[in-house]
Amino acid sequence: MICFDVLHPYYLPQYLPVMQELQARGQVVRFVIYRSQDQQAALDALVAQNGLEAHWVDSQEEALAYYLKEKPSWVIFGNSFDAAAKLKGICKTALMQHGIGPKACYYTVSESDMDVRFVEGEYRLKRLQQLFPHKTFIDTGYAKLDPIVQGSEAGLDLEALGLDPAKPTLLYAPTFYPSSIEKMAKDWPSAFSEYNILLKPHYFSLSKPSYKKQKQLLEHWGNFDNVYLAPVEQANLLPFMASADLLISDASSALFEFAALDKPVVWCDFYHLRWSYRGILSFRFKNRMDEDLYRYAGVAAHAASYKELKAVVDQQIAQPESFAAKRAEYTLELAGRVDGHSSQRIVDYLLSEEAS
């Protein structure tokens, strides 16, 4: 048996292609999922939609007790796990980080005591090996994108969502912090009336009480005729990425995932910062973001303010190939090979003699 540790719903799109590959090779797969007051609706929907064999827990302590009792051959994590060292000699542990974006946590998560980490591309492999020379890293690519590359992800039925299939489709997928949501015009969809707009925020923006102002704005925008707001239960970004012609986002993993599909991206350089991240405390913001944020800025067209956004979007829709060379260059470094076979490489390793 191989277990996937699901602390948050957004880990699942990274896990599912690997699950399918494991099941195709006759492996038993189980998902250890953490109950959550804020996220339970999304979790229940994902379990039902994907027919997952789930074991529910309330804490890391319960998850650890389950792993110690069941002794799976592997436990795959989407983030650090404080008790990973206690699984030594019981089962193997692997890390599949749930995003490929520029936040510093992409690297610091490897401080966790995992047996192996699957990584995306040679640049990040080398950098992680420099930071953690005694740990094992395997370059497999980014499994989350496999269904789109393979063509098995059909996308959304725009007409069924009340949108016009004849219009170009924009995907606005902001992260929760730092976010551009609060800096957008209150009625911005009306200024983009010639486009369909898919709103796919981070689920924190719709479920966490501390982000209720973001939720109010998103729900307001969802009332426009040319807009579809994904409910929190619709947790998988992939159908939205498959259906969109252009992505609008801030410094998020989604930005790099979309660019890896060779589609145009507009990067919002305007975002709302908490007081604790401004002025002389701006070092906190810099610590939250990785130097890769600036290294890879050329992957997208940039809008310095909301006022610039419409013109930048129009230009990228008219000339979608204008950043194609940079997208290809940076995708190779950030996502590695985008060939639809990342999950196969991960499973090859999990079932190999090298890993046993």
Pin down the residues of each PLM region.
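Short hydrophobic segments within beta-strands
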Residues: 5, 32, 96, 171-173, ...
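A nucleotide-sugar donor-handling region in carbohydrate enzymes
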Residues: 113-182, 206-207, 322-329
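Catalytic binding pocket for nucleotide-activated donors in carbohydrate/polymer assembly enzymes
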Residues: 131, 139, 253-330, 334
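Active-site and donor-binding regions of nucleotide-sugar-utilizing enzymes
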Residues: 3-151
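Short acidic-hydrophobic, aromatic-tinged amphipathic segments that line or gate anion-handling sites
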Residues: 53-59, 228-232, 298-309
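A donor-sugar binding/catalytic signature common to diverse glycosyltransferases
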Residues: 76-77, 89-95, 233-281
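C-terminal alpha-helical cap of glycosyltransferases
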Residues: 338-356
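Donor-nucleotide binding loops and adjacent catalytic segments primarily
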Residues: 164-243
